[in-house]
Amino acid sequence: LLLYGVIFSTAVNFGLPVLVRTSGWVFVFVLLLTLLLTLNDPIGPSSIYYNVLIQDNFTCFIKVFIIIASIFCIVVSFDYIREERINAFEYIILLSLSILGMLLLTSSYNLISMYLAIELQSLCLYVLAAFKKRSAFSTEAGLKYFILGALSSGILLFGSSLIYGFTGTTSFEEISKLSTGLSTLGDLEYSGLLVGLGFIGAGILFKMAAVPFHMWSPDVYEGAPTPISAFFAIVPKIALIALFSRIFLFTFHDLIGSWQYIILLCSFGSMIVGAFGALQQRKIKRLLAYSSIGHVGYMLIGISAGTLEGLQGVLIYIILYMVMSTCMWTTLLSLSYQNKVGRVK
C-alpha cells in the first residue's frame, strides 16, 4: 500500500490522483482476507519466535472482532474523507499500521513484544489524532495525546524493566511459573514483582482511559476527526482489554489477592465517572468519550472476578460494546453529513 501510494500519488502522467479511497478499499480487502485466515486458522494453536508471539483460541477470538471493527471504521470514514477533502493516502497507511500493532498486541506473550506492539499502535494513533491539520482542535488533541501517551509508555516500560530485573525473564510463561508460590513469601522478589505489576497495570489503564487515568480521553475524542474518534473508542480498547486479561488472569493469576481489589476499585470508579461525567456534557463527542470510560469499567469488573466465567462475560461484553459503539458513531457521522457540518461538536 505504501509503495502504491508513493508511486502513483506523485505520478504526473496519471494526473496526480487522489488515492485515499482506493487505498482504503484495497486495505479493506486485505482485512477481509486476514479475517478468513483467522477464522480458518490453518496452523492451529502455536507459538512463534520462542513464545514471543502465540496463537490460541483466545487470540483468534479477539483478532476477529478487531478486524471486523476496523473494517467498519474504515468504511464509514470514506464519506468524511470526501467531505473534508483529505487527499493524503497516509491516512490509510497509519490506520493499517495501528491495526497491525493491535493484532500483534493480542498475540504478545513477552514483555518486549508487548511494548513494541503498544508503541506501534500508539505512534500511529498520535498522528491520526492530529491528522486534520487545518483544525486547531485536532492539533491540540494530537499533542495532548502524544504527551500523555508518552508518559503512560514510560510507566509501562518502567514496570516491565522492574519485572525483568526481579525475574530475569521477559516471557509471560516463565514469569507465571516464577510467580507461583511467591505470594506465600515476604521476600524482596515478591515486593518487586508487585511494584512492577502495578506500573504495568497503570500504563495499560492509562491507554484504556480507565479511572483514575481517564483525563485525556474527552479532550482527545473531541478534537480528533470524528472517524478517528470512533476508531479510538472501539478498536484499541478491544486489544488492550485482551492484553490486560492475559497479564492479570493468566500470567499473574496467583497474585490475585494483591491486585483484585485495586482493579475492582478502578472498575467502580470508571463506571461512576463515565455515568455522572456524561451528564455534565453538552458536546456529543465528549459524552461518548465518557460513555467509553464507563464501558471500560464494566469490562474491568469481569477481569477483577479472576474466574473463567468473568472472562467469558468480558468477551461477550466486547461483542456488545463493538456493535453498540459502531452503530452510535455511524449514526453520528451520518447526521453530520446530512447537516453539512464539517465538525461534530
Feature roles, as predicted:
Residues L1-K345:
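Alpha-helical transmembrane segments of multi-pass membrane proteins predominantly involved
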